[in-house]
Each structure stands twice: as structure tokens, then as C-alpha cells.
């Protein structure tokens, strides 16, 4: 959430930044006007409360002197009525301010490229060269069915579209991948967490999914619970409402969890395969950092995600997302896209973001600076390390062989009992 004081004092700069994210200046002008009304009403109510205190003292003195205080009592009752009217106006204005400020996206960092959509993202670097095949390649969904390791038909029967069963060596490959990913992140100083797979609405607000993106989630009717769309939500909210000792920062968390997405608005997109599912595993990275180090931490986090792809020897590229393509809470985001041969393109497999103090303000996550003893908002970062199902898709396609088998990447073989190939059964 943005700082209302910052909008008030640096209106033009904030408006210019938010314009690049599709927010009209009229919205901010309305917000500014409401803020001015609110502050004026606060002055009025404080003046009336001061008058009420004077009237109360006059009544007490009159009673001590056994004098008639009926006029003072009438005056105080009128003051109380006026205060009540203003308080009601303040409550309405506060609600209007909240309805606007809670759906404003984060302001982009100065280094973020300005653009409207994914076409304006900027490629930063590439790693690895896509393999040149001398045979007709198959898509990962065809490979998965032929190898008897992925079963969409029964997934659709048991649940519905965009669900599947991993089976046999498919299940082992998935498990090997997320164990490998977690082990690599632990080497980089991350603490492993197994979080709840349901969170409450306050947690969804804290990380920015609520109120704006409720349609993208699965809520449990009649409860305060939501199935997590990403482990970012429980991991970040671990410290919601807390004050952390500054000496403990930075703090790194990692977790493997299922992620649940309604995929609202994705009808007709990626209807086959592992790219877009309602339920998928993802290894998440979350960091809590001081503001002065958070952008160094973003580079490290991105490198952590890249390290996984490099160890798996999967070609990828890194993009700096433009202002129009970044997520709601992000101030800066790098996307990692892995090469998918059957689609002859790169597809997103990780997104690493610095939200600065945007989530911390919503969730009230603060730290006590050991230098001056002051309590301040910290910066939160999050990133995929990696999306497991999409990594399975990339391995199946990049490591496929002419005979229909798939070579298991070397780094995963210790996790799969030394197996080197997934062969047709």
C-alpha cells in the first residue's frame, strides 16, 4: 500500500509514476481531495472537543458552586452532537480513501522500463543455447502420456479441466525437483518452512492479493480461509504485525507448497500441458531486508533462481518487466523464461520482485534500526525458485530422445535412485 503522506507531499511525482501503471491522475486527484477534507474535519473535531472540555469544566464548577448549569449542559450536548456528525463524515471519508488507496499498485523503481504490456519488457541476458534436434520433437503433454507419467484424462474425470495426476516416474521427477531446489536454496542461507496451505483474509490483504484480485483465488465458503495462490502469502505474513530486531536482517525463507489459482481471464490459454493449472507445486523464496540493501537482495534472489536452471542445464533468458506488465505489489521485477522447444519460445518459470515497503505497510512488518533505535518499515521480496510443473515440462521437452525416452538431468539422478532415463513402458 502506498503512503498517503507521500501522495500528499509529492503528488506530481507519484501521479507520473502511477500513470505508467495505468492509474489516471483523476483517481489521485480524488484521493488528494478526500485527504484534504479529512484533515480539515479532524481540525474541526479537535476544536469542538476542546470546547466540549471547557464546557465540561464549566459544568463541574457550576455544580460545585451550586449554580444553574442548564445552559452549559445544553451547550455541551450540542457540541457532542456536532462531533458525532463530523465523526460520521470522517468514517465515510476514511472508507472512501481506503477503497481507493488499497487498490493502487506500487510505484515502479526508476530503473523499471516504461511500457504498456509484455511486448515492452526488456531482455537483460540469456544463458545456454537451445538444443538443435535432428528428429521430430514432441510436446511435453504427449511425452508425459506416452511415458505413462502424466494423466490429464483422469485428472479431468476426478476434478476437472487444468488438473492432472503425476504417476510413476513423473511423480518421482516432480519430487526430485522440489527437493533439489530446496536443497540448493538452503545452501544460500534460506530457512526452510512448511507453511499453512490456507490463509485468512488479512494475510491476503497483507501481500496485496485482496481486495483487488479476489476473483483469482479459491475461497472456502462460509469461512475466513483462502487456498494459497503462492507460498509468498503465508511466508510474508509470518511477520505480519511484528517488529524485527534490525540485527537479524536480512531474513531468507524458502518453502515448497501447492499453489491454487482460479486462472480467471485465462480461458482458452494454455489449455494443454503443465503451463497453466489450477493446482501446481512451486518452491518460493521470500526475503525481509533493510531498504538500503533490498535491491542487492533482489539481484541475489534472481541469481538463486538462475542457479537452479543452470544446474539443470536448461536454456533461459532474464527479462526486466515494464511498468505495464509488473505485478500489483512489485516495484521492480525480473522474469526468468525457460526455453520450451515444442512451442519454439521462452515461457515464464520464475518471477523475482522487490515490493519495497508496499507489502510491509499493508501487513505492518517493521524492524527496529540498531543504528538509531527507530522503528521503520522494512522491504519484502519474493521469487519463484522455481515453478515445479513448468520445470518438469522444460525437462521433458529439452531432454527428450528420438526413441521417446527422456534423459534425467545429472543433478537429479541422486534424487531418483541413480536413474538416467525415463523410458516408455
Curated annotation (Swiss-Prot):
Record-listed ATP binding positions: 261-263, 348-351
One Gene Ontology cellular component annotation held by this UniProt entry: cytoplasm
Gene (UniProt): serS
Coiled-coil residues: none
Gene Ontology MF terms in the entry: ATP binding; catalytic activity, acting on a protein; serine-tRNA ligase activity; transferase activity
Keyword terms: Aminoacyl-tRNA synthetase, ATP-binding, Cytoplasm, Ligase, Nucleotide-binding, Protein biosynthesis
Residues holding L-serine: 230-232, 284, 384
EC number(s) reported in the record: 6.1.1.11
InterPro entries tied to this protein: aa-tRNA-synt_IIb, aa-tRNA-synth_II, aa-tRNA-synth_II/BPL/LPL, Ser-tRNA-ligase_type_1, Ser-tRNA-synth_1_N, SerRS_1_N_sf, SerRS_core, tRNA-bd_arm
Main location: cytoplasm
EC class of the enzyme, as a word: ligase
UniProt note: domains: Consists of two distinct domains, a catalytic core and a N-terminal extension that is involved in tRNA binding.
Lineage: Bacteria, Bacillati, Bacillota, Bacilli, Lactobacillales
Known partners and oligomeric status: Homodimer. The tRNA molecule binds across the dimer.
Physiological role: Catalyzes the attachment of serine to tRNA(Ser). Is also able to aminoacylate tRNA(Sec) with serine, to form the misacylated tRNA L-seryl-tRNA(Sec), which will be further converted into selenocysteinyl-tRNA(Sec).
A single GO BP: selenocysteine biosynthetic process
Superkingdom, taxonomy of origin: Bacteria
Pathway of action: Aminoacyl-tRNA biosynthesis; selenocysteinyl-tRNA(Sec) biosynthesis; L-seryl-tRNA(Sec) from L-serine and tRNA(Sec): step 1/1
The protein's name in its UniProt record: Serine--tRNA ligase
Subcellular location(s) per record: Cytoplasm
Family according to the record: Belongs to the class-II aminoacyl-tRNA synthetase family. Type-1 seryl-tRNA synthetase subfamily.
Known catalytic reactions: tRNA(Ser) + L-serine + ATP = L-seryl-tRNA(Ser) + AMP + diphosphate + H(+); tRNA(Sec) + L-serine + ATP = L-seryl-tRNA(Sec) + AMP + diphosphate + H(+)
Amino acid at each position: 500500500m502506498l503512503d498517503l503522506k507521500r501522495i500528499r507531499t509529492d503528488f506530481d511525482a507519484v501521479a507520473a509514476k502511477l500513470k505508467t501503471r495505468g492509474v489516471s491522475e483523476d483517481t489521485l486527484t480524488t484521493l488528494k481531495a478526500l485527504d484534504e477534507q479529512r484533515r480539515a474535519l479532524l481540525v474541526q473535531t479537535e476544536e469542538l472537543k476542546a470546547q466540549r472540555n471547557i464546557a465540561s469544566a464549566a459544568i463541574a464548577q457550576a455544580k460545585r458552586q451550586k449554580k444553574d448549569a442548564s445552559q452549559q449542559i445544553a451547550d455541551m450536548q450540542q457540541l457532542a452532537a456536532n462531533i458525532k456528525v463530523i465523526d460520521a463524515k470522517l468514517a465515510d471519508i476514511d472508507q472512501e480513501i481506503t477503497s481507493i488507496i488499497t487498490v493502487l499498485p506500487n510505484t515502479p523503481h526508476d530503473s523499471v522500463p516504461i511500457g504498456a504490456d509484455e511486448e515492452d519488457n526488456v531482455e537483460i541476458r540469456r544463458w545456454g543455447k537451445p538444443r538443435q534436434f535432428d528428429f521430430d520433437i514432441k510436446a511435453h503433454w504427449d511425452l508425459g502420456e506416452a511415458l505413462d507419467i502424466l494423466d490429464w484424462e483422469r485428472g479431468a474425470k476426478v476434478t476437472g479441466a487444468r488438473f492432472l495426476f503425476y504417476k510413476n516416474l513423473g511423480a518421482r521427477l516432480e519430487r526430485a525437483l522440489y527437493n533439489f531446489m530446496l536443497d540448493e536454496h538452503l545452501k544460500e542461507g534460506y530457512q526452510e518452512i512448511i507453511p499453512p496451505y490456507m490463509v485468512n483474509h488479512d494475510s491476503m490483504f497483507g501481500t496485496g492479493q485482496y481486495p483487488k484480485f479476489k476473483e483469482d483465488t479459491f475461497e472456502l465458503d462460509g469461512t475466513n480461509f483462502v487456498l494459497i495462490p503462492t507460498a509468498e502469502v503465508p511466508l510474508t505474513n509470518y511477520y505480519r504485525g511484528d517488529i524485527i530486531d534490525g540485527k537479524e536482517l536480512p531474513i531468507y525463507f524458502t518453502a515448497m507448497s501447492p499453489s491454487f489459482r482460479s486462472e480467471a481471464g485465462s480461458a482458452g490459454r494454455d489449455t494443454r500441458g503443465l503451463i497453466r493449472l489450477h493446482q501446481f507445486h512451486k518452491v518460493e523464496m521470500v526475503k525481509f531486508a533493510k531498504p538500503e540493501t533490498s535491491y542487492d537482495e533482489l539481484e541475489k534472489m534472481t541469481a538463486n533462481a538462475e542457479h537452479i536452471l543452470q544446474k539443470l542445464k536448461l536454456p533461459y533468458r532474464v527479462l526486466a518487466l515494464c511498468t505495464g506488465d509488473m505485478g500489483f505489489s512489485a516495484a521492480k521485477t525480473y522474469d526468468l523464461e525457460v526455453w520450451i522447444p515444442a512451442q519454439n519460445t521462452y515461457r515464464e518459470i520464475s518471477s523475482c520482485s522487490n515490493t519495497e515497503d508496499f507489502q510491509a505497510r499493508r501487513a505492518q512488518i517493521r524492524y527496529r534500526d540498531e543504528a538509531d533505535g527507530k522503528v521503520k518499515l522494512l522491504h519484502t521480496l519474493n521469487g519463484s525458485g522455481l515453478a515445479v510443473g513448468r520445470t518438469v515440462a522444460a525437462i521433458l521437452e529439452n531432454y527428450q530422445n528420438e526413441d521417446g525416452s527422456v534423459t534425467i538431468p545429472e543433478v537429479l539422478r541422486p534424487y531418483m535412485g541413480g536413474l538416467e532415463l525415463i523410458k516408455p513402458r
